[in-house]
Amino acid sequence: MSDLGDVFDAGRDEFAVLGPVLWNPIGEATVAEAGLRPGERVLDVCCGAGSSAIPAARAVGSDGHVDAIDLAERLLEQGRANARDLPQLTFTHADATRWDTTGYDVVQCVFGVFFLPDMDAASARLAGLAKPGGRFVVTTWGEHAIWPVPEILGDAVVAEGGAPQASPGRGPGERICTPDKLRGWLTGLGLEDVRVVTFEHSMPLDDTTSWAIVMGSAMRMRLKGLPESLLPKVRARFVDLLRDRKVDRMNAVSLIGIGRTAE
């Protein structure tokens, strides 16, 4: 997963641009649905700059604690800077597949499980870090989220001389992109009392945010190998194509799934 950490580190500035309009609202919604209470212990996996870890720390208060882990050190630095008033929140550079502290009231992962090397095995292991009767909370993209932005980016790359690529699809995220799929997947991990909430959200796509979602997310990998001199042309073409196709908002509908571990 270290390569992915490097991708998000490289997009730190753009990731910050997206915080108020994308990551933070979804992170706050996740914490609200998780029902965090004062004094609880929380593990936030793939925490980024803390969009869900920071509201979690506020929810558990000074008697609780949040461990927030990620592979992107520059995003962790950003999170620490944003959480100076929250001593109950610790940001740690760590691999989620190796974290072994147990006994959490809540283990939450926002937009992260589909990046794990083996989504099923790694997620089952993470759920096992919660105490008996604890909650495992997963937030993922809804079925129609993000698209057609990746395709338009691909068209812009090709139009400026980049190599065409087959559509990447949604990868493991395809298996958890509807309420029924996410509910079934969480149940398959052995969780009980599973429920899924749909959080409706969208993000405006202007000249700044449209490029930020490319450079501050995994879409950045589509630009790998392109010469730096080509990037301004790809950006200009991308913005033009969005305008030509009348795409001025990105669907960011998200699914929040919550299940309990066996007592």
What are these model-derived regions, one by one?
Residues 3-11, 22-23, 49-51, 171-263:
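Conserved Class I S-adenosyl-L-methionine
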Residues 21-40, 55:
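Conserved alpha-helix/loop element of class I SAM-dependent methyltransferases that forms part
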Residues 41-99:
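Class I SAM-dependent methyltransferase SAM/SAH-binding core
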Residues 66, 136-137, 193:
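A short hydrophobic/small-residue beta-strand
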Residues 97-107:
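A short acidic, Gly/Pro-enriched loop at the edge of an enzyme's catalytic core
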Residues 105-120, 142:
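A short SAM/SAH-binding and catalytic strip from SAM-dependent methyltransferases
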Residues 120-135:
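A short glycine-rich, Lys/Arg-flanked "PGG" loop and its adjoining helix->strand segment in the class I
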Residues 137-163:
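Conserved class I S-adenosyl-L-methionine
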